[in-house]
Each structure stands twice: as C-alpha cells, then as structure tokens.
Regions:
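A detector of single, family-specific signature residues
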Residues: 1-310
C-alpha cells in the first residue's frame, strides 16, 4: 500500500523508456540475437546427427563447421551408406590429427532418415545465415545516425561494431536518464543484491535484470581480459580472480566496462586507459617491509639467503 501512496503523490520515478528510434534498433538487435540462438541450436542438431551415426568429427576437427569438416559432411550426404576410405582430400596443412585418426573418426554409417534430417538442417542453417546477413545490413543502416556515439563506445576495451550497436540499443545515448553510473549498472543487473534480514545475509547474487545487455557485456569482458593491449583490464581481472573466483571477477569487469561507457557517453570523451592504469601501480611513496621485499624478490626468481652470523 505504501507504494500506491507515494505514487499518488508523484514520488515514484518512471521506468526507463528509450526514444522510438532506439526502440526500433533494439528490436532489430534482439531479433539478430534470436537468429544466432536458432543457428546454434541447428549446429547442435547437426552434431547429434553425426554422433548417433558414429561419426566423431569433433575428435579430429576443432570446428565441425569448418571447411574440411563441412567437406566431409557433404561427402557423407552424397552416399550415407558408403564407407569413406580416402581422406587425403580432406586433410589440411594445419591439421594435427593423423590420417589414421581421421579415418577412425569417419568410420560410421548414416541411415536414410538421419541423412535427410541432416540435409534439412543444413538447408535451414543456410537460410538463417542469409536472413542474418540481411538483418545486419538493416541494423547498420538504422544505427548510422548514432555513428559518433558508436565510435566512442568502440574505443573501450573488447567492444567491436555490433557489440557497440547492441549496447547503444539497450541503454540509448542520453545518459541523463541515469543519475549515476551505479544506477545504470543496477538497471543492467550487474550489481549484487543486498537481501538481509535480522542481520543475516540471504544472498548477494546479481539480479535477473538486463537479460540482453548483461550477456553482451560479459562477452566483451571476456575479450578484454584476454587481449594483451589492455593490461589495466587484465590486471584488475587477475587480482579479483585470486580473491573472488572467475565468475565474480568477470561480472566485475563487465560492470567496469558499463561504467566506462556511461562516462564516455556522458562526457563525450573517448576511452582513456591511463585512468585505470593508475590503480595497477603501487604509490611511489609506499615503503615495503623486509618480508614484502623478500617475497617480491622470490616471486621474480631470486634466491634470498640470510647474512652469515657475525
């Protein structure tokens, strides 16, 4: 009842509703995400068709949908009941598996029903890919008016063109609707909950908000921590990982990215890595204890021995 009472006095803040053009862009980007999920599901069905027919292409190929593996799949569909005895045409220079291992991986037999199912799946995947390409062209044309903001966002760590478009489509370009970056991070579901009762903390998990932007930011965070050109991000991730584990550390990096994006859009400034590298270095005036100095030297591979007794 108290919520209704404060709403009656116009004390409830309104929900974030982006402009119409941002909503249209958001609808297109989310549909692209759905097409990607459909393609992934079809890839899993292809893998299932091969596995139940005793074809173990994933044992010798890092990508079952690569050039060589796709050629073998096409060869299987030409005559599903015929054994493959020569794989020399399918082997590449970069392939680590031996000829015998490849022959063992293709030592299967596919029934007519599985072969027809596999043809339908591959045809559906081709149509999905064509639809996705057409949709991406439409997305790029729709997002062209936000090119300055997209270029700003892409200066941040681990964010490329479609990731930047996805972020803009979710949060918009006007950051005045969020009082602080903490409000934006809470809206995106990147802040821990504070569920406490009678002095007992029930849970500190992140919320379920941000069903679309949160996975996108996590993907960008994973790219950023692996890239060598962003040491400030990787150093922060490694420090958090030691104390809190990978999952909590990567969520913290995703929140860091969203905070960076908020400040870039609000101040109209590109990403400045120096603002985040300061925390990687200890203060110049800091004094190390003897134990700390010995520990640092030992970590660098030096052998520290005590001086001889006088």
């Amino acid at each position: 009842m108290w919520i209704a009472d404060i709403f009656k006095h116009d004390l409830v803040a309104g929900s974030f509703i982006p402009p119409a053009d941002i909503r249209q862009l958001r609808d297109l980007v989310r549909y692209r995400w759905k097409l990607t999920n459909l393609t992934t599901g079809e890839k899993n069905r292809v893998q299932n068709c091969l596995t139940v027919s005793n074809f173990k292409l994933d044992d010798v190929f890092s990508n079952v949908f690569g050039k060589a593996a796709s050629a073998i799949t096409a060869r299987i569909l030409e005559n599903p009941t015929e054994k493959i005895t020569d794989v020399s045409d399918f082997r590449t220079k970069s392939m680590k598996a031996t000829k015998e291992q490849v022959l063992a991986a293709v030592d299967g037999e596919m029934c007519a029903e599985q072969a027809e199912k596999l043809r339908i799946i591959r045809s559906h995947m081709d149509r999905l890919q064509l639809c996705k390409l057409n949709l991406e062209s439409l997305i790029l044309a729709t997002a062209e008016k936000y090119l300055p903001q997209l270029n700003l966002v892409m200066t941040a760590q681990g964010i490329q063109s479609f990731a930047a478009i996805g972020i803009i489509s979710e949060i918009g370009v006007d950051m005045s609707v969020f009082p602080t970056s903490k409000h934006l991070c809470s809206w995106a579901g990147l802040t821990p909950q504070n569920n406490e009762s009678a002095g007992k903390k029930k849970t500190t998990r992140i919320s379920r908000a941000g069903a679309y932007i949160k996975p996108l930011l996590v993907q960008c965070a994973l790219c950023a921590v692996r890239a060598k050109q962003f040491p400030e991000v990787r150093n922060r991730y490694m420090a958090l990982k030691k104390r809190r584990g990978h999952k909590k550390a990567i969520i913290a990096i995703a929140r860091m990215l969203l905070t960076v994006i908020y400040n870039m859009l609000k101040k109209n400034e590109p990403y400045n890595p120096e603002l985040y590298r300061k925390g990687d270095r200890p203060p110049a005036h800091r004094e190390f204890s003897v134990d700390e100095a010995i520990f640092i030297l030992q970590r660098q591979g030096y052998l520290v021995t005590a001086p001889p007794a006088s």
